[in-house]
Amino acid sequence: MQVILLQRVAKLGQMGEVVNVKDGYARNYLLPQGKALRANESNIKSFEARKAQLEAQNLETKKEAAAVAEKLDGQSFVVIRSASDAGALYGSVTTRDAADAATEAGFTVDRGQVVLDRPIKELGLHTVTVTLHPEVAVKITLNVARSPEEAELQASGKSIQELAAEAEAAADFEIAELFDEIGAASQDE
């Protein structure tokens, strides 16, 4: 099916282009979302008449997105989740969790704007892309931790695995000292 794009669509084209797409993609996504019109003579004429208005509207939304992007770019958000001692999450952090974390901090982010390269299934710092406008994208950091204190430690640069290794080494040292004391006490007798 041929459609006229009413806005820039990633991996498809710019506003005003007539492109061929699969019928299902057009019927189920592009047309209902208002991102495209069927390419017939009457729609092409109406698009040409509205083109200046659509371009002005697109430019305005791009400016608004750029203003939000300036504030949002590089921000870090804490997401608290339960996890195993090894740092594996029980479940995963989703686009909804990232959007909720940004919304709690005062930003207007929809879950459809959040792009995860891969599922987040472990504790730590994860970089996530937020597409505010088809031409404006920013990177944010999700600090996934078991508690706010752990999130602060991760933000300072220590990983959960390093902290667990330090705690285990300290416990081993205490056990070794205890056995040394027991051995010294038995030799005294």
Swiss-Prot record:
One of its GO terms (biological process) is translation. GO terms for cellular component: ribonucleoprotein complex; ribosome. Keywords: Ribonucleoprotein, Ribosomal protein, RNA-binding, rRNA-binding. The keyword Transmembrane does not apply. GO terms for molecular function: rRNA binding; structural constituent of ribosome. Pfam families: Ribosomal_L9_C, Ribosomal_L9_N. PANTHER family: 50S RIBOSOMAL PROTEIN L9. NCBIfam families: L9 (TIGR00158). Binds to the 23S rRNA. Belongs to the bacterial ribosomal protein bL9 family. This is Large ribosomal subunit protein bL9. It comes from Cereibacter sphaeroides (strain ATCC 17025 / ATH 2.4.3). The gene is rplI.
